[in-house]
Regions:
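Charged helix-capping and loop-helix junction motifs
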Residues: 97-102, 172-180, 231-234
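Conserved N-terminal beta1-alpha1 strand-loop-helix module at the mouth
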Residues: 1-80, 148, 152-154, 229
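Glycine/Thr-rich beta-alpha phosphate-binding loop at enzyme active sites
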Residues: 148-182, 224
């Protein structure tokens, strides 16, 4: 069985770029092996309210993406051995330019990105793929047919969203095991990552037992950024759940 791929999401720039990277250093010091950083978007429509608020505050504090690139590149030079990922929205890529974004990824050994945007933005993702950068695709809680078809067409790893307030499940499928089984039966063979509302070790175990290949964890940890002791305890709880034999 392949190791469960646990990726920790760090929202950049709130309250400052430096503060976000201090917390990322704490993650690495406590055994984290993969971190996904974002760049603040003016329309982070896929994020939950706390992340939207963080991005808005980060944008107000610093809207110069080159500042983020420089800080992240410095962080990468200090920590060359962890898996570094990125998540960016369409407006971010349009602002910095696809070629500049690709160059940043290549310079920092970033092999995986989540690029959120309209279907017309697919050309940017294909440019990244051609440059050796994998892009994740997204299937929301209601598992729309067009999202499944797109995942089948591209063969990209899937981020499968957990429950979303105000959104109905597809055909009453609410649990990880029935939703992942449904996607596998539809022909999705690529890795499936559980995301959203992953708050504790039990949530990680449920996703693992349902057949998820990995998970993205973010908001539950960022909510503890003012309490390092509780933050470290939760990091270890999540890691243990990701490694425990099942």
């Amino acid at each position: 069985m392949k190791p469960f791929h646990l990726v920790y999401y760090v929202s950049m720039g709130c309250p400052s770029i430096e503060y976000s990277l201090q917390k990322a250093e704490l993650y690495l010091a406590n055994g984290v092996k993969a971190i996904q950083f974002d760049l603040p978007s003016r329309n982070p429509y896929r994020e939950n309210p706390p992340i939207r608020e963080r991005m808005a505050r980060a944008w107000d504090a610093c809207s110069d993406y080159e500042e983020y690139f420089r800080a992240l590149s410095d962080f990468r030079r200090k920590h060359p051995d962890f898996e570094m990922q990125m998540v960016s929205y369409e407006d971010v890529i349009l602002t910095v330019g696809t070629l500049r974004y690709i160059r940043f990824c290549q310079e920092n050994q970033i092999k995986t990105c989540r690029i959120s945007g309209s279907s017309s933005f697919e050309i940017a993702r294909k440019d990244m793929n051609a440059a050796g950068i994998d892009t994740l695709t997204f299937i929301d809680y209601d598992m729309k047919e067009e999202e499944i078809a797109f995942a089948l067409e591209t063969g990209r790893a899937v981020m499968l969203r957990n429950k979303r307030r105000g959104m109905l499940s597809r055909d009453g499928m609410t649990e990880w095991d029935e939703r992942i089984r449904f996607l596998r039966d539809r022909g999705i063979q690529q890795p499936i990552y559980a995301t959203a509302e992953m708050k504790c070790g039990r949530d990680i175990l449920e996703a693992r037992q349902a057949g998820a290949d990995g998970a993205f964890v973010g908001s539950c940890l960022m909510a503890l950024w003012e309490d390092d002791q509780k933050l470290v305890e939760l990091i270890h709880e999540l890691a243990e759940a990701g490694e425990r034999p099942i």
